[in-house]
Every structure is written in structure tokens, then in C-alpha cells.
Amino acid sequence: STESGVPDFRSENGLWNAKTRFNCTPEEIVSHSFFMNRTDDFYEYYMQNLIFPDVKPNATHYALAKLEQMGKLKAIVTQNIDGLHQAAGSKEVYEIHGTISRAHCMECGKEYDLDYTLDKSHWKEGAYTPLCSCGGVLKPDVVLYEEALNDELIMKSVKAISEADTLIIGGTSLVVYPAASFVNS
């Protein structure tokens, strides 16, 4: 996704090495406890650094979608949260770190799409925090630090990898666990 204009996380100039105005690291900001305790600050960072509504899939996204259409690719296992694989036409995508494309109300559970989340008329007054029609805070469907990965997605991912004749690994440093261990499973 970096070729599409989405910044990476772990390089020298990546998001995790950037300074923030919140007196803590970016990794602390995208933690469950920070979200729960400083929701408005979380959303300010999230909206400015993790949401890129204008990015488009690149040639690699389209090539992978084409391979899937041809029956040559069974699944995409990704740590990306940007939804670009689906935007390119891929159907069987396992987003193990979740997606920015959805959010759900922490009060009533209602689900919303990214367009709703980005619509400022739904934001808490004076903040970036999107609210449900019931007034509850929306939580993005991304896996924050201190949260568990979805067991069903992990099982599907490991199964797809273990059954693959050929494995294409791209755009990752393979240092984030447990995803990095999937290739050894």
C-alpha cells in the first residue's frame, strides 16, 4: 500500500517513529487503553495518520485481484487495514489487523462504514470522534494494541498459507507477531 501513498509503520520515517503531540508514542496512542481513556485524542491521531480516503489501489493490488479471478490465488492474508485489496477487486481477503472501512457503536453495536465515520456531521462537537445515532462512541474495526486478533481469521489465514503451493510475501518486514509466524506454521 505504500505505493498507493499509505505510509508504512516501521521504517526510519514510518508512523511508529514519528513524534506526536500527545506525550506518548504512536503505538501507545493506538492501544485499547488509550482509546478508552483518551478517545478524542485517539481519534485526532487516527483520522490524521491512519485514514487515507483518497488513496487508490496500485498495480500490485490489481495484479493480485486478477490472479484471484483466474483461480491462481486462493486468498490474501494482510496486516494492512486500508481496504485497498477489496477496492482492487479481491474477494477472499483476511485482514488480520482489521479494517478502517468499518466501525461499530460501543453502546448498541450498530455497524457503520467509513463514509459515515468521516462525515463531520456525525463527530462529537469540537473533536474528531464519530458518534452513533444513539449517541455512543464508534470504535473502528481495527485491532488495537492490547486487543486479541480474531481467532477465526487466524485459523483461515494459517489454513490458506499451509495449503498454498506457492506463497507470495510482500510489503512486510515480517517482524509483527503472530502474523510473522504464519509462514512457519
Task: Pin down the residues of each PLM region.
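Conserved catalytic core of sirtuin-type NAD+-dependent deacylases
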Residues: 1-185
